């Protein structure tokens, strides 16, 4: 592990000297290489899918694991979009002259070597590799064992493109030890690794945060809520709720709990249930919900569960204050939404909720780098430092000060 990370650290110096034009050219070649090698990627993914079926992975996890021509094309397009983004490093963020006559510039620079630990989704391999390369960071990737064949195939294609351009393949590499012990070693290698970004289940995040000596930006679970206020346009509210839960249930920005104002519950809940029944969503509700519609009972534990599946909790609340109290208690700081036409109620919700993204009259499903115009993201940070929300190339940079003098002493 140490030799592997030494090579990654050494490679970071090579990357720091690459021009933006060269990086963009290599990224475009990577995108094309994914298209050219799509048959090999699909074959490798088929091995993972077969293993997943044998190991009884959930339908949501199987969906996250799948690679097909459409998803590979989306991966290639994502890399091209990253290439088209403004150069993130070497930018003068601020500048001034001191009383001593020193000219100071605050300049964006790469973080260095970034270890990314993730589960299930093979597209994370290409997305994060491209984002790190664009921002002049070396990436060390540790994907989930369920996607090992897919991740290795994708990394092989990207590394071949690097070598074709006389660049070390260690700029983008997979951790050689895929065991839990490998993760344990990686997160303590602060001599070589500058940042760890874990994205995955609650157990993974907790383990990394509790044991890492390397700095961590965590991408924690998405315990997302939508609150339908008494002054919502119900047709819009139902459309938003259906999208937030059913468009892709197995992702972190999908809604897990729907809160409905008690003032409209009797008329709204039957209509809401009818639409979720069409989507075959399993519904769980509080006692007040069960008095109005036929659903299973919800527990306190359910409110704290990220299902990543087509299952939804429902709760009737007495106005925006109780909705906020529920979210404060059970939310994970990811994405929260309110549907209302009342400006005062909306602002109260948006200002009171402490989350990376808060929505008015829109689905929580928009919390991702592509939708925010970042190209892609290495994940959605639930940290407050140093990045929050969809973490694109800006979040993969830090800064230093350049000071220009003319013989000044102190």
UniProtKB/Swiss-Prot annotation:
SUPFAM superfamilies: ALDH-like (SSF53720). It catalyses: L-glutamate 5-semialdehyde + phosphate + NADP(+) = L-glutamyl 5-phosphate + NADPH + H(+). The keyword ATP-binding does not apply. GO terms for molecular function: glutamate-5-semialdehyde dehydrogenase activity; NADP binding. Its EC number is 1.2.1.41. It comes from Sulfurimonas denitrificans (strain ATCC 33889 / DSM 1251). PANTHER family: DELTA-1-PYRROLINE-5-CARBOXYLATE SYNTHASE, GLUTAMATE SEMIALDEHYDE DEHYDROGENASE. Keywords: Amino-acid biosynthesis, Cytoplasm, NADP, Oxidoreductase, Proline biosynthesis. Belongs to the gamma-glutamyl phosphate reductase family. InterPro entries: Ald_DH/histidinol_DH (IPR016161), Ald_DH_C (IPR016163), Ald_DH_N (IPR016162), Aldehyde_DH_dom (IPR015590), G-glutamylP_reductase_CS (IPR020593), Glu-5-SA_DH (IPR012134), GPR_dom (IPR000965). The keyword Oxidoreductase applies. Catalyzes the NADPH-dependent reduction of L-glutamate 5-phosphate into L-glutamate 5-semialdehyde and phosphate. The product spontaneously undergoes cyclization to form 1-pyrroline-5-carboxylate. It is found in: Cytoplasm. Pfam families: Aldedh (PF00171). This is Gamma-glutamyl phosphate reductase. Pathway: Amino-acid biosynthesis; L-proline biosynthesis; L-glutamate 5-semialdehyde from L-glutamate: step 2/2. One of its GO terms (biological process) is L-proline biosynthetic process. GO terms for cellular component: cytoplasm.
């Amino acid at each position: 592990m140490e030799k592997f990370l030494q090579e990654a650290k050494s490679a970071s110096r090579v990357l720091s000297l690459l021009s933006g034009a060269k990086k963009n050219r290599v990224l475009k070649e990577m995108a094309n290489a994914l298209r050219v090698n799509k048959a090999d990627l699909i074959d490798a993914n088929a091995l993972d899918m077969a293993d997943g079926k044998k190991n009884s992975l959930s339908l949501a996890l199987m969906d996250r694991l799948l690679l097909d021509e459409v998803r590979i094309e989306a991966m290639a397009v994502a890399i091209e979009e990253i290439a088209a983004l403004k150069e993130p490093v070497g930018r003068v963020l601020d500048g001034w002259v001191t009383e001593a006559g020193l000219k100071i510039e605050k300049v964006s620079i790469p973080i260095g070597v970034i270890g990314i630990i993730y589960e299930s989704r093979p597209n994370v391999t290409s997305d994060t590799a491209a984002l790190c390369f664009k921002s002049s960071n070396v990436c060390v990737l540790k994907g989930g064992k369920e996607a090992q064949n897919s991740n290795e195939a994708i990394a092989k294609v990207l590394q071949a493109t690097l070598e074709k351009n006389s660049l070390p393949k260690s700029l983008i590499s997979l951790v050689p030890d895929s065991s839990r012990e490998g993760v344990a070693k990686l997160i303590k290698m602060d001599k070589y690794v500058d940042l760890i970004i874990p994205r995955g289940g609650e157990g993974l995040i907790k383990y990394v945060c509790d044991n890492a000596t390397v700095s961590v930006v965590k991408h924690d679970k998405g315990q997302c809520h939508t609150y339908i206020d008494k002054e919502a346009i119900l047709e819009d509210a139902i459309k938003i709720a259906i999208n937030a839960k059913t468009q892709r249930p197995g992702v972190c920005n999908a809604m897990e709990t729907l809160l409905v104002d008690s003032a409209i519950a009797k008329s709204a809940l039957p209509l809401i249930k009818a639409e979720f029944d069409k989507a075959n969503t399993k519904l769980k509700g509080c006692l007040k919900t069960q008095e109005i519609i036929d659903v299973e009972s919800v527990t306190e534990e359910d409110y704290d569960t990220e299902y990543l599946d087509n299952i939804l909790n429902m709760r009737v609340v007495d106005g925006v204050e109780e909705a906020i109290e529920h979210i404060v208690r059970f939310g994970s700081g990811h994405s929260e939404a309110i549907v209302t036409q009342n400006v005062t109620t909306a602002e109260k919700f948006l200002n009171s909720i402490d989350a990376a993204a808060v929505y008015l009259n829109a689905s929580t499903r928009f919390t991702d780098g592509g939708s925010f115009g970042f190209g892609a993201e290495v994940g959605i940070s639930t940290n407050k430092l140093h990045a929050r929300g969809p973490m694109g190339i800006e979040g993969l940079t830090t800064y230093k000060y350049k000071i220009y003098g003319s013989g000044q002493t102190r």
